[in-house]
């Protein structure tokens, strides 16, 4: 993912946690907030409680892939943070994908395809 489409700075994450809308589901938490850009930006966080670096990276890769597969269905102009939970590692791909779509629907991030 290009740097322009990722959230990297600490202040960006803090702002999202304080002022962004959130939805909690089985294996993840999604925070979102409208940005003034014409594209979405993504940040992914994994708690130290989940395990060591190999576990962190696996959870991060799974969330990044779920986002990539569904990015065409999302409205543009939002910053999003995906927070991995314990079930991120054990859930099936279908379950993880369904959870992501359900949380995005709850936050009204999915484009209306009428």
Tell what function each PLM region has.
Residues 1-114:
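Positively charged, solvent-exposed patches that mediate nucleic-acid binding
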């Amino acid at each position: 993912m290009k740097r322009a489409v990722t959230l990297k700075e600490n202040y960006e994450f803090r702002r999202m946690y304080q002022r962004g809308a959130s939805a909690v589901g089985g294996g993840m938490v999604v925070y979102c907030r409208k940005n003034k850009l014409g594209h979405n930006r993504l940040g992914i966080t994994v708690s130290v409680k989940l395990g060591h670096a190999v576990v962190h990276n696996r959870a991060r890769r799974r969330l990044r892939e779920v986002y990539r597969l569904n990015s065409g269905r999302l409205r543009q102009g939002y910053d999003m943070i995906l927070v991995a939970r314990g079930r991120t590692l054990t859930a099936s791909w279908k379950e993880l994908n369904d959870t992501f779509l359900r949380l995005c629907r709850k936050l009204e991030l999915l484009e209306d395809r009428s």
